[in-house]
Design a protein with these regions (language model features):
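Short amphipathic helical patch at the helix-1/turn junction of helix-turn-helix
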Residues: 2, 13-14, 42
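Short basic helix-loop element that most often maps to the first helix and adjoining turn
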Residues: 6-25, 50
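Conserved hydrophobic/aromatic packing and binding residues within compact polymer-binding modules
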Residues: 8, 22-23, 33-36, 62
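DNA major-groove recognition helix of helix-turn-helix/homeodomain DNA-binding modules
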Residues: 27, 46-61
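Recognition helix of helix-turn-helix/homeodomain-like DNA-binding domains
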Residues: 27-42
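DNA major-groove recognition helix of helix-turn-helix
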Residues: 37, 55, 66
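Short, basic-rich loop-to-helix N-cap that marks the start of a DNA-contacting helix
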Residues: 40-50, 69
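Short, charged recognition helix plus adjacent turn
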Residues: 61-70
């Protein structure tokens, strides 16, 4: 899902954190997070929820269902 990948990169860049930092916070390995950002893999529901909470946006925003972050 390309929009998810783009939004993850954008949000991480805005927050000025590394992929590794985000991965540790949401409880996944860095390689898995890289795959999310590369559009090679989509997170499961629990990880998607953790990412949305960490970036303080809705899961719908991450998935491209809305352009309103919250």
């Amino acid at each position: 899902m390309q929009i998810l990948a783009e939004r993850l990169i954008e949000l991480r860049t805005q927050k000025k954190v590394s992929r590794r930092e985000v991965a540790v916070i949401v409880g996944i390995v860095e390689r898995t997070y890289m795959r999310y950002e590369n559009g090679e893999r989509d997170p499961d529901a629990p990880v998607l929820r953790k990412l949305a909470d960490y970036y303080d946006v809705s899961a719908d925003y991450l998935l491209g269902r809305t352009d309103v972050p919250k």
